[in-house]
Amino acid sequence: MNRKSWFKKIDHIGIAVPSLADAIPMYEELLGIPVEHTEEVADQRVNTAFFSVGESHFELLEPTAEDSPIAKYLAKRRGGMHHMCVEVEDIDAVLAEYKRKGVRLIDEEARAGAHGKRVAFIHPAATGGVLLELSETPDSSED
């Protein structure tokens, strides 16, 4: 296969937590670095906290509604790794190609994510059990 990969890098690992107030100090101690950024992502009904680790990040996800995907995840698993996110150049092109190939998607169109990024999720049934998030950074052509 000679085509160039759509993936630029692993952007972050998403970790579901019941409480950012409890998790942030624990991760600051474990990682030896302060939290870099916190943000509410209303569309996904979560509060997030990011820690930079090289070119990638740990993203802590706290639900803000009982019916949010993170709340449902926590009800089954009490916490832990939720998803892996990869940065792509052109999320619309990647989604179009996956749809053409019949890849099972959670999001058929990109939506708003943290940091002003456009995101979409691929269903775990299409990835061997891993929830994979695609992320396009605004003005990513300037990287």
Where does each model-flagged region fall?
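An N-terminus-focused feature that recognizes amino-terminal "leader" regions
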Residues: 26-30, 42-45
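Conserved active-site tyrosine of GNAT-family acetyltransferases
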Residues: 23-28, 51, 98
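Short secondary-structure junctions
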Residues: 32-40, 102-109
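C-terminal "cap" of GNAT-fold acetyltransferases
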Residues: 41-57
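A short, acidic/glycine-rich surface segment
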Residues: 36-37, 67-72
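Vicinal oxygen chelate
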Residues: 1-6, 10-18, 49-52, 59, 71-97, ...
